[in-house]
Amino acid sequence: MYKSLFTASLLALAIASPIAQAHQAGDIIVRAGAITVQPNDSSSGVKVDRGALAGTDLGGKATVGSDTQLGLNFAYMLTDNLGIELLAATPFTHDVHVKGAALGPANGKLGTLKHLPPTLSLVYYPLDKASAFQPYIGAGINYTWFMDGDTSSRAEAAGFSNLQASNSWGLAAQIGADYMLTDNIMINGQIRYIDIDTQVYVDHNTLEGGVRAKVDVKVDPWVYMVGLGYKF
């Protein structure tokens, strides 16, 4: 659905008449809008990572839910066609579910994790600066910082606690477009794919004197953002 809406928006902008000059070297661009992280996830089975039962395969898999937050985007135009861009956002909160593992009552919603996904990209704008419609492509690097998680009440009642995830470095790619409404104000839409690999950990405080379970998760989300921008 997101991809279809984004494609339709690009087509509408492409046929609109240009009314304002677009980007040029030295411009600073600030964008803000709604940003959605939609995981395209897969995972290993759950295993005991630490404790008396270390190495035990508990089976099952983990999934990560979507979330929408305020997205922020800062760009500096190095030339009329090439810019450097930083993606930021308010912290995302994702539900983590486990299915089919030998975790008893903890199967289902294990808890929630928060993260920040700053992404630095080099962005190329192929059209002349006289065009009000400015599609672009970009590639860069992402660092995803996972904050301490919250274990669900159901999992806590079963003896689980201390839900955490490891931080991640990965590559990112994007397409997007600006449409200048005035010399300074623009509409923006963008799609990104980000490589995020993490390990999710949770402690069990009663089983065999205390153990820790781990599952490797490829989050690999599609990231959608629509909003407004201002050029300085």
Q: Across the structure, where does each feature detected by a protein language model lie?
A:
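Transmembrane beta-barrel strand/turn architecture of Gram-negative outer membrane proteins
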Residues: T119-S121, W169-Y179
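Gram-negative (and chloroplast) outer-membrane scaffold detector with strong preference
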Residues: D27, Q38, N73-S152, V219-F232
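Short glycine/proline- and aromatic-enriched beta-strand/turn motifs that initiate or cap beta-hairpins
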Residues: Q21-N73, G229-K231
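Outer-membrane beta-barrel translocator domains and adjoining extracellular loop/strand segments
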Residues: S42-R50, D95-P105, M147-A158, V200-E208
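Predominantly the C-terminal beta-signal and adjacent terminal strand-loop region
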Residues: T93-H97, T182-F232
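Cleavable N-terminal export/targeting peptides
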Residues: M1-G26
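Extracellular loop and loop/strand-boundary signature of outer-membrane beta-barrel proteins
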Residues: T56-G60, L103-G111, A155-L163, G210-D216
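Short sequence motifs at beta-strands and strand-loop junctions characteristic
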Residues: A62-T68, T112-P117, L163-G170, D216-P221
